[in-house]
């Protein structure tokens, strides 16, 4: 099961998708860049990060510290 939670438009050819998914009974949150071709659906790129909720809880405070 995969659910898109949020889509952030970067520009005409790029979006960032935040998705929640389950794999082998585990929950993951994936933040990934998508390329938007002139015709067709947005396509995922290799640029992204998929972590379980506990890993995101550890990472988010560190990101907040870096960006101030």
Model-identified regions with their sequence ranges:
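A short, structured beta-strand/loop element
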Residues: 16-47
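Short linear motifs in intrinsically disordered/low-complexity regions
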Residues: 12-13, 52
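Gly/Pro-rich active-site loop or hairpin
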Residues: 9, 47-49
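Mixed-charge, Lys/Arg-enriched low-complexity segments
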Residues: 49, 53-68
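Generic detector of short, locally flexible boundary/turn motifs and exposed helical patches
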Residues: 13-17, 58
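Negatively charged, low-complexity tracts enriched in Asp/Glu with abundant Ser/Thr
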Residues: 1-11
